[in-house]
Amino acid sequence: MTLGSETKTDVEVPIINGKHEIPQEENDSGHSSINTPDSSEPDKQVDKFVKITIQPSCGDAFELHLSDNELVQELYQTLLDREATCHRTCFSLYLNGTAVDNYSEVRAIPGFVDGCTLNVVDEPYTIRDARLHLRQVRELLKFGLTEDQHEPPCTNDAQSYLTTINLQPEEKKEPKPSDILPPDHALPGCKERSLAHLLVPQPKELIALKDIAFSPYNPPPGPRKLRGDVLYIDITTVENRIYHVTCCTRGFYVNNSQDGRFDPTVSNSNKTVYQSVIELLQNVSPGFKKVYPQILKRRQEKTLVERLPTSYPVSSWVGNPLKTDGYMSDSLRAIELTEPFRVGFEDHMPGLLRDWNEELQTTFEMTRKSISERVIRDRSYYKIHADYVNAAARGVQSILDGNILAINPGEDKKTHMYIWNNIFFSLGFDVRDHYKELGGDAAAFAATSTDLQGVRAFATLDDPKLNTLGMAIFDYRGYRVTAQSIIPGILEREQEQSVVYGSIDFGKTVVSDEKYHELLEDAAHKLKMLPHTVISEKDGVKEELKLYTSYEAKGIIGNDGRKYVLDLLRSMPPDVHYLDDAEVSEAAKTLGYPRKFPHKLSALRRELIDAFCESRLVTFIQLTAKKIRDLITESKEKNDETLIKQAAEAETELSLLFMAISEDKEFEAKNKVVQDAIKEACAVVHSIYEDRYVMKFNPDCFSSNVKHAPTENLERQRRVVVDAADFLLTQKIPELVQNLKDCVVQPIDGDNLADIMHINGINIRYLGEIGKRLENSVSFARPLVLSDIVARSAKHVIRKINVQITADQLSASTSHILNCLFSVVLDPSPIAANVAKKANKKNGKKRVTSAWSSLTTSALWNSIREDSASYYGYPIEADSLEKFTELHDIQKTALFRRICKVMGVQLVARDYQLDNSTAKKTSIFVEDDIINFFPIIKHHEPFTADAKKMFIRGQQAMSIGASREAYECIGESLNLMTLVYGVMHPDMPQCLRALARLSHVLGETGDALNNQHKAAVMSERLIGLDAGNTIIEYINLAHFAFGALLIPGSLRPLYRARYLMNLVFGEKHPVMAQIDANIGLILFTVQEFDTALKYLQSADAITKTIGEPRKLKTGLISNLIARTHAARGDFRAALVAEKETFAIYSELYGPNHPRVNESSEYLRTLTQQAVTFQKKMLKLDNSTNITELFQAQPPTVTSLFDTLNIINGILIIGVPGLSSLGKQQNGTTEESKTTDVAAQLDNETLD
């Protein structure tokens, strides 16, 4: 993260006015600062902003504004970001002649005051400094090159399409038709779904240097080292001249070495010693001197959001084909990526390995009492966790490439374990039959996911007293690899000696520890785990022990003295619908539950448990309150003083009960009436106890491996778990299905669908249940859900095949599998036969043919059908993928994309013509289409709770129309996120989008466009170029660009969004109708009526097809269609469309609504115009211009803006005086804005 606000530079600045400002984007809203201290926070140290001067060793001095809590190290990053100083890396900062510490806060530096001057002093080079310098040179020169698609599949460099769109106002008045009219692939009804348009157009390459490499003469011999030589490098310029360069302590100079002759002394022709390689090249290479300024200009044109690396690895499922003449040599890359012992930070920490566990635990335990302490703690923990995930991703790829030796190489490959870079890796197989009774390999695979869910649950606790391991899961090339940090001392002793809490023999023997009880009590309470007693038997002696978690959880005290808890796979209660011998509700039985499942580790999600407990609590409160209300009513009717007194006492005690419940405290009722009310309510809601409300879950109540104590009421405990599962089946799933049918939620792809299901507490295994309920529906969600079932079932089938494939067969096998899916393969693969034949010949013996080689279309489809039935409970009747996609209107390209993404396959971006009937008989895919595999990463994602709370508060303010308060809260949330995460994070686009909408409502068009542009770029780079969220960001960006009257700038994101929607889903989606309505309205505004009509008619047809024909948006679209017909002179069609508008408005609002009256008036106008037009047509002669015969009444710009706002879910309620709000400068400005402006940003409430 960089810092500061500085004139003429491209560095990050503090959050001001709720925005993360970047220089040269001067769209200040004028709103007051939102960074006010929270009085509720104890001991908060208020940050101060100071202005300092920095005097670089080259170039002019410059001023910098920064917060005094920044680290000095961030000043270094500021200098590396500046154009004038980015090429110098070996320096120190001095204040008053004293070097300052890199890792201290600036406020802690003696003499650091407002107005002071820091001097940059060049330091002598070491080999570490030299290597870091060369890396910086390489990073700078990469800005002139196209994105290299063929570097490792998991990188931190992601592309952005929006960099190709100009959103700046231009001087020319009229845009060209080519700037406005759509490309062919964005037209309604377009059948072309080529992936080639998905890639970002690349600018012309700026090549300043051919290669820079370490010389084979390294390291410097002793005599030269004593004279200051550090490193030797060879540089090949664009003029094809090779310069042998010596890096000495003073800098870089050209030496006298030649091919085959070593002479590191200073060259006779160029005796200058340069501080940087860049300065040296500018003096020896004219080509470099010419191109380098252009590279810097291109770099400066990119904002921080566009060019900074992402925190976590990102991948794309498409890329450019490998061209031998386009793959450039890079000696530094060759060294970094071909040496398996390199861990990625040797140049920063030479000779050291990071202790990930110590770093994670130390930062996790940092104090968090005040908000400033929490920011520091969250920022440190997030940064280290991101480094850990990046390191683990690199390790996983090296392991499966065979570059890392297992710690148990003599055992079966599936049991191999690895330690690399102080990270422990294990494969997702059932080693030593640990999960034999639970499902074998399937259970072992699922256990890692449920374990990660447990880690996430413990990490969300406010003050966890126990430590969990750093953990990440990777699905790569068919394997599941789990990466974990290493507990100190765990490898030095047997597991039996390490575990002090839990069981290591599947529940037969359980150990417990009072210290762990104290630490687990609070965690178990917050996670709604019920303390329970089990029986442990050892050496014939039985003992009753109390557990706060499942017996599977293990407590280990590390050599560092910390108390760790791991194996948290049973932190949530089991899902009884997938346990063969479990009792389920009657409703579940009618739906065919319990069902046989590949494993017995199915668990309910925490979101469901929270929703279920909240629902039961509401029911409990309602029942007890009703009992007391009935008593009060009875006492009043009978006028019995005794009853009145009892009712008053009961009402008082009930209030105390409710207060205790709200504060999460225990309460013992003494009043007999209240006691009876509580008992009755507890019986209805199935409380764990008869006489008090407790809704907690025993995670072991359905486990047969552990013996329960006789005192445990298993019947009640199991009934609560059954009720929770029934709540999922009878309330949450029907609620989601109805929301999908009503278009309340509008997922675009499988990732969006999974997120929505998880938010509602629904596991992915219930996809089949949702699919059944949507099967006969016209909802847009039906093809989405069913295609996701097929994609996930295909993933399960292909995963089993991939683990049997050697590295040399990956391209052939993957292309063959895709051909089996999307074309017709009747015979085994000839490629496979050749591969097997060569392998058999090489080994001199017969080998078993690979599973993929005999695969055919029918065999693969039958396997997918079997998996769909066994895993998702959804029987696929169609006997081929072709019939299945036709039956359910599934777009093949969307299904193809989803399968590639869940498999982690990267393919060449070209037109595969999956819907071409002639291509089905041939091989659509070839080996060269497969570029690479990339890992699918799952991990616990640290977050800042303070930012989330502020964002929720802002959303609440937004929902009641308090725009000013909402803007401040969400701006403060973005401020906190920036302090913790840096410039980019997946949570930030949501904040920026909300700020953009609020700015739009408040009339700040520039701010709205600026914030939304950042949101869209972040979404592209962090989530994906074709992700569902990215499409939504494009629509919002187009909206605000239109508000700024940037017509081409508003249409190009919409055309891109339409192409992506056609690729990701297809046309029959409410978001596609929204896109077409936007395009049609904007084209109508610029009088491109014929093209506008195509889009408006498409929007109207889609809206009616997906089952929402009678809504406000439909009426608005019909009105626009009528006006477009009228503008074209087709009054008969205009009348038909407007009559439909009138009918919709009448049904929605009744006869006297302004919209109904307006539509009625427009019908009369159209009728009059049609009559007038017909009369003039009768008098027509050859000299008459037909366009002069009618005068269409165009809508006002204001009405068009209002229509666009409603289509995109923004309702602005204006009041008199709104237009003058921006001009008010008195003390009541803020109050008047809050009072006069109400913004409702919920899309569906408009309908």
Swiss-Prot record:
Residues covered by the Clu domain: 329-579
Region Disordered: start-end pairs: 1-43, 1222-1247
CDD domains with a match to the protein in the record: CLU-central
Gene: clu-1
Name listed for the protein in its UniProt record: Clustered mitochondria protein homolog
Gene3D superfamilies assigned to the protein according to its UniProt record, in alphabetical order: Hypothetical protein (hspc210), Tetratricopeptide repeat domain
Any one GO molecular-function label of the UniProt entry: mRNA binding
Protein family per UniProt: Belongs to the CLU family.
The organism of origin for this protein: Caenorhabditis elegans
Biased segments, Polar residues type: 30-39
Keyword Ribonucleoprotein found: no
Compartments (UniProt record): Cytoplasm
GO biological process, one term: mitochondrion organization
A GO CC term attached to the entry: cytoplasm
Described function: mRNA-binding protein involved in proper cytoplasmic distribution of mitochondria.
